[in-house]
Amino acid sequence: LNTQKGDFYNAKSNIKVGFGVEITGISQLRDPFLDAQYRSQISKLGTTDAHAAGFEQLTPIFDEATMDGVRAAFISLTSSLSTLSTQVGNQEHDTMVRSNMQILLNLFRENSVKLQDVREDMQMGFEVTDIADLNSMLKNISELNTSIKNSQVLGNPALELQDQRNQLLDELGSYLPISVKYKNQEVGPGQYVEILNVDFTDTEGVKHSLISDGLYGQFDADVLNQPVQLTLFEAKGATSDVTEVLGSGTLKGTLDFLNKSGDFDGTDFKGLGYYEKVLDSLVNTLATKFNEANVVLDENGKPTNLLNEDGSVVESFDKDGKPIYAIDPQTGDLLDGNNGNAKVYAYPLFETSDGSTEFTAANIKIATGWSNGSYGIRPSNNYVTVDKDTGSTANENILNMVKLLEKDISFSAKNSAGKDITFYKGSFHDCFANIEATLGIDYKSANTMLANQISVLNETANSRDAVSGVQLDEEGMDLLHYNQSYSAAARFLTTLDEALDKLINGTGVVGR
């Protein structure tokens, strides 16, 4: 309050003119531009955060900080094959090679199981946590809209409810890019209430209604099939498949990780599918190459031991009278020129557990014949006459297998169109190291981008708080002013107390 022309203690007039305070209303002070900027930034951060979280789950699978995983198994396998080449015919050393190969297959299978666990965990989290929280958020915002309108009808601005709604809108913005629109609706003469609409525009420019005043949409995720599908039941009744049209946000980041395979499906992100495919390609190439290497050849270097149903040898010739031999590049099976009617008697080292022709990290196993000792690694894949007593010291096939582990090989996997896409050329050991390095680069890149986006988001949050939040400098100055006023008032009361004491106790004592 402010008094003008004198005070209550020293005035020559009875007329006092004072200026009081009239409160006409209380409202929030917010900058719509900063709110929109904040929600745009947090949506981008949500995408990167989901990517980084996915890579973090893959790191324990491929990041072999200690030499006791796949790379170590390849080294042990090479060593045991080298030893076998000097001990041709020694069953013990063949068993050692098989044991080291089994260790390698177990590691591949373990990695495959872990990848599947990551996929199932992320699918479950996406459906049970992300989608459930998002749907709950949409419902809560809609209910707050109704509560705020009811309060405004009674003349209450409902600022606390608006604070809750703004906080939920910020959280909603982390899931997908949203646009928030406010408008005033007249409910009586001079009486208005606030109407809130929330939409999101997809990458194709189509606008979808999430919240329309008291109505709200809901999301549904199908995680049982591949790829994972996301459907939106909009607030105004429409139904849309938004799996491929999310521009940013946690939903997009999680779907990217679950559905995308980088070069193998023509997308810009190496998700979980990419690492599943490259691991299976490594396993399939290993099995196919070693099965081919263990085939018996005749004196002309051609596959032999092609048998008919009755056990007789098939003699297949082309038009020039030359023998026809071939190896299927996909399965590693021997092909014959007898219209496919001949049986192949070969010595495969690997076979699939599910009977399929494609080897994967999940289905590869040691071939039954090698496992039960019916045959082993062929020391020589040449057709030779072997003396039953002295045997043979030929070992060129074992040496070829050692070289096979060390030579450069092209590794590829099929894309969505069935075309082979080469992703690496090098040795088996280096191929796995390349998978590890690729994951490390992706993980580091995601974390770096995440840190940058957090920094930008914090700057935007500070700018927004400078408008709608508490100004700490101003509050500090007010505290200093209060302290000074308090000190002055205390000094005035002390002086007044001393004066009264003097008047009461120090006067009227004359003549005592």
Which residue ranges define each predicted feature?
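Structural signature of extracellular appendage/secretion-system components
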Residues: 1-512
